[in-house]
């Protein structure tokens, strides 16, 4: 079974070797057919602490690493230019 991969924006990097990634999904409302954006936040493992807030990253599903962390950062698609 292939592992799930998704892309999102880093919203927090305050924890050691852990980042919080916000993933936006566009869905259509069943009744009104309006397109809505749903955001979900995932904690992901960042082994080298190389991500910063604002980076666009790809994360991949993995075995549970802690109580709330079961994703790992695969690569950084674009770096942010924050201080």
UniProtKB/Swiss-Prot annotation:
GO terms for molecular function: rRNA binding; structural constituent of ribosome. Gene3D superfamilies: Nucleic acid-binding proteins (2.40.50.140). Keywords: Chloroplast, Plastid, Ribonucleoprotein, Ribosomal protein, RNA-binding, rRNA-binding. GO terms for cellular component: chloroplast; cytosolic small ribosomal subunit. PROSITE patterns: RIBOSOMAL_S17 (PS00056). It comes from the Eukaryota. GO terms for biological process: translation. The keyword Chloroplast applies. InterPro entries: NA-bd_OB-fold (IPR012340), Ribosomal_uS17 (IPR000266), Ribosomal_uS17_bact/chlr (IPR019984), Ribosomal_uS17_CS (IPR019979). Belongs to the universal ribosomal protein uS17 family. Part of the 30S ribosomal subunit. PANTHER family: 40S RIBOSOMAL PROTEIN S11 FAMILY MEMBER (PTHR10744), SMALL RIBOSOMAL SUBUNIT PROTEIN US17M (PTHR10744:SF1). This is Small ribosomal subunit protein uS17c. It comes from Porphyra purpurea.
């Amino acid at each position: 079974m292939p592992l799930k991969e998704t892309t999102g924006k880093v919203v927090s990097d305050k924890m050691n070797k852990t980042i919080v990634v916000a993933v936006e999904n566009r869905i259509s409302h069943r009744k009104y057919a309006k397109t809505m954006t749903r955001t979900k936040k995932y904690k992901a493992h960042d082994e080298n602490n190389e991500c910063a807030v604002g980076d666009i990253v790809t994360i991949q599903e993995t075995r549970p690493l802690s109580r709330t962390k079961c994703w790992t950062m695969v690569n950084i698609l674009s770096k942010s230019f924050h201080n």
